[in-house]
Amino acid sequence: MIRSRQKVLSLVTWTLKRSIVVNAVSASSVDPSFSTMANTTNVAANTNLNKTTTEPGNIRNAPQLSILQTLENAEFIALGTPPTLLTVHSPPSVPLFVRRGALTSIYGLKSTSNTTPTYGSSSSSSSSSSSSSSTATSFTSSLTSSTQPLIRNTLEFPLWWDRFRFNGGHILSYQKLISTVPFSTLISSSSSSLSSSSKYGDVKSFANLILDGSSDWAILNKTAIQAYTGNSLSISMHKLPKYISKSLAKFLNISRIETGLWSFWNSGYTLLSGRGHVGVVGSGGVYQLQLAEDEEILIRKSAILGVTVNGPFDLENCIIKNDVTTTLYLPQEGEQNHKVKVKLNVEERPQGKQVLVQPSAWDQIVLGSKLALNWTRLVWHYQKVFFNRISIILSRFLLGNAEFVKVVGPRNILIQASPHLKQTQKDTRRSFGGSNSEEITQLNEKLVFIEPQINPESGSKSKSNDYLSYVEIDPKKGAVFQNTPNFRDSI
């Protein structure tokens, strides 16, 4: 009985399994997408469980960064308002120089599942050959193998000796990025290096310069260059001209005055020439101004970020010093030179012996009064010069009227909106060494000119009024009386 029951149960189970298979086959024959739908449902369920992205429309007020896999020329795109970020699309085998501490991100790299980035120090011959001018550290990653480099990063100090000489010991360091495939970077306008000026609290913004070889750029701000690239781009340092050129002085019908650019702490500028892309930063907003031919503009020296030039010697043909505050406090003409003229009555020289001429009491009173008047004028003049200097310093400190320069067109000028005043305050005391200060402070030698009054009388006998005498006023000794047969040797 038990065996018969087991056979019956097994028969029923086999019958049920067969009916299920037959129904599935019949369903698939009626609707072929039945099995596909089941598989798709399983895959979708697994995808929803492992999904790590969202739709781009779900992210608002954030521009999407583009990724370029094929690129021939570099592209610089400023982001934000004001543009505080710069995205750079760099082609392969073209080095990209980024200010140390400004690199924010590297993206757009094609990766494979069998590769792992490796980090280490560079031991190539190129870095060892440039070890005298820069120190280099690098990291490399590979696409197909650990020996094929993808991106090489090297820390370099370009033009370090010229920057040390012309920028008062201020040296900039840059990261050199070069890749075998196109890549993109995100660069910040501020730098975390020790030489950055973030301590002033100002916001920096980007401006992109595209050099096509038709004109050059003179960058006057020593910390303005944030990133640059281009195999044909040439960057060099030159000395700032102290005086304007002879041709400009002749054109303006003036003497060779100062340009107002040179200073002890900043005596050089950076010249950009050739072909390439340069990203410069300025405090606040950066604006461009185009001057037509024979057009002039007065602009604050510290607000100038860059000027278009034609070669390294063209900067002296377009910028002239124009110190507004110094011009306002110039003394009037006739107040600089003070000469005291003393007239003495000429006495006759007796023959045969020397006679010491003693001036009368009235002559001594007149001479003493004129000497006192001369010293009073000198003291008053020095006092006016001193207070003029104090007023200039106070006006620059309180009103902010720093050094102004005149730019003559045709030029393109980059202007930064809110330059800090640290460098201008350093140049304040040196601003009195120009041509205007020489006109204020020059004093003539303290000599006394004698206009003798000779009253000869007719007759053969020599009288006392023929004897000539003069007096010289020395600030240390006072009045010194001397005799002379004529005034040719003494005056």
From Swiss-Prot:
Extract the InterPro entries matched here: AIM24 (IPR002838)
Main location class: mitochondrion
- Provide the protein's localization: Mitochondrion
Q: What is one process in the GO biological process aspect for this record?
A: inner mitochondrial membrane organization
Q: Where is the transit peptide?
A: 1-61
Q: Which UniProt keywords apply?
A: Mitochondrion, Transit peptide
A single cellular component GO annotation: mitochondrial inner membrane
Name the family: Belongs to the AIM24 family.
- Name-wise, this protein is Altered inheritance of mitochondria protein 24, mitochondrial
Gene behind the chain: AIM24
